């Protein structure tokens, strides 16, 4: 029997965007190259998680007074070390991290008139009717007398459009979790702080009981599907077969595939053209235990511990929507 699939906001978002991407990510567990945006987001989250603790407020005060990380050698050093660890250090990445960290610190970081008692709060919601399980992490819950504000940091290049915000899975999941974790705080607001937008970083949303009730039935629907998901299902809702999104529909449909026609294609400025990590074929390695279970996949053989199992060389053939199929009569064309 396959392992139970527990929902998360990112898992649902992937499932909605493309069935093949979901299959590659959560069933095949194929490796992915990290990118600078993800690296910067990881580093910023680490700094926020540390500075929100009262014992580190002296670093916050120094940085805010000088408006630069130079004022705290310890924080500056940690940012640089973290970027190196993420294999993404460059002066450009460091300066972008500094800018984003300053935006986060400058926006009610300690929750004026509120308390931040549980940063990086983990939750697991289990419901029998409707039936679902969903887990997640809340970046920063700010508790007030009768209100809870859940702050989530975003390092993306674009903010949510109106439709993306009003039906945001992550925000609804956070609000559901808040009902369990902080039952006395009935007024729940979710605030997304977009760190690349210093002039207007905040987007806020709250939901009604009716909206949350409907969301729970949607969770049951997705939970049922992903726990009976097959390779045939993986080809049933491909991003490439969806219509191109309208201006107010955000990043969806074929945009998820990217416009690159082949691996390594360059844009006019000489930089790599982005594409879905599973669009084209690639080689990788798998670590398999004695019972035949997959332990880990990696592009680098050196990342796998051979003492824990057998290392196998693997080939991924690419997305079926973008892979040219062999044709016995191809010579006629």
Explain the meaning of each model-derived region.
Residues 47-122, 126:
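A non-catalytic, helix-rich entry segment at domain boundaries
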Residues 12-57, 256:
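Nuclease catalytic cores
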Residues 6, 177-333:
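Metal-dependent nuclease catalytic regions and adjoining charged, substrate-binding loops involved
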Residues 25, 46, 50, 103, ...:
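Residue-level signal for well-ordered alpha-helical scaffold segments within enzymatic catalytic domains
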Residues 36, 40, 44, 93, ...:
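Hydrophobic (often cysteine-bearing) scaffold residues that line and stabilize catalytic clefts
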């Amino acid at each position: 029997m396959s392992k139970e699939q527990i929902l998360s906001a990112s898992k649902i978002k992937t499932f909605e965007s493309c069935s093949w991407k979901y299959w590659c990510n959560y069933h095949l567990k194929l490796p992915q190259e990290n990118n600078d945006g993800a690296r910067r987001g990881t580093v910023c989250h680490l700094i926020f998680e540390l500075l929100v603790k009262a014992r580190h407020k002296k670093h916050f005060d120094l940085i805010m007074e000088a408006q630069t990380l130079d004022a705290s050698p310890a924080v500056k050093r940690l940012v640089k070390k973290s970027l190196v660890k993420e294999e993404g250090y460059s002066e450009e990445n460091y300066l972008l991290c500094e800018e984003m960290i300053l935006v986060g610190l400058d926006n009610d970081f300690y929750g004026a008139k509120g308390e931040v008692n549980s940063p990086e709060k983990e939750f697991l919601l289990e419901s029998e009717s409707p039936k679902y399980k969903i887990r997640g992490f809340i970046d920063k819950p700010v508790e007030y007398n009768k209100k809870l504000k859940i702050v989530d940091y975003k390092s993306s290049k674009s903010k949510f459009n109106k439709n993306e915000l009003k039906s945001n899975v992550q925000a609804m999941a956070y609000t559901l979790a808040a009902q369990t974790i902080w039952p006395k705080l009935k007024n729940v607001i979710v605030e997304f702080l977009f760190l690349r937008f210093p002039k207007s970083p905040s987007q806020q949303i709250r939901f009604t009981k009716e909206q949350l009730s409907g969301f729970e039935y949607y969770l049951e629907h997705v939970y049922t599907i992903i726990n009976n998901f097959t390779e045939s299902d993986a080809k049933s809702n491909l991003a490439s077969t969806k219509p191109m999104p309208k201006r107010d529909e955000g990043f969806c449909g074929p945009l998820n595939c990217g416009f690159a026609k082949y691996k390594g294609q360059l844009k006019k400025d000489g930089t790599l053209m982005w594409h879905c990590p599973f669009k084209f074929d690639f080689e990788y390695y798998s670590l398999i235990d004695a019972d035949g279970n997959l332990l880990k996949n990696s592009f680098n053989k050196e990342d796998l511990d051979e003492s824990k199992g057998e290392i196998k060389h693997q080939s991924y053939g690419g997305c079926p929507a973008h892979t040219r199929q062999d044709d016995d009569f191809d010579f006629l064309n």
